[in-house]
Amino acid sequence: MHRSPGVFFDHDKGKTHASGKLLFNCRVIPNRGSWLDFEYDVKDFLYFKIDRKKKIFASTLLLALGFTKLEIADEFYESEQFTFDPKTEKWKTKFNPENYKAKNFSEEVTNAKTEEVVIKLGDKINFLNAKKLANDGLKDILVTRESLFGKFLHRDVKINDEAEGTFSIGTELNDAVIQQILDANIHTLQISVTNSINKGPYLLTTILND
């Protein structure tokens, strides 16, 4: 079959899985040479195939090209630093209005300097509201432990010297993971910036499982 060279985007129209979930794909057709396909599976792992042969994690392709897993994370994701504050038992980070583009509700947010609650739990807040807070001088904030749930590590975190003593890039944070990190006396985390609109964690979870 002959097709014009180019990059083609498509999905399976929900026919692959019983849930009807749309599985997106991309095909790269060069002027000469092998076709390269990228596709998601139902678990949102990202794969590639050459000439429609066996699918392999997309991160494997990048690793073969000389990237490290950290370099892949740095290339495709921005990151934010969170530091645990033993006094308040909350996590300190920079206030970034961009984080509120993808949601209109919020966790509790405290001004790290004044210790004033500037956003109450469950308050509706959007980018414009967040931008106003930043313009009014809000820089560093404290957020609860629960606010980190569902976020993903941007760098490996080694908690001990055992074979499974490292939480790797792409590990999803939950209460148990955070507690093990704190028990190892590690109080600073680098976390990838993801959202539900245009920066999903799919490549991070692919890296983790590669």
Q: For each predicted feature, which ranges?
A:
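N-terminal non-catalytic structural scaffold regions of very large proteins
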Residues: 1-210
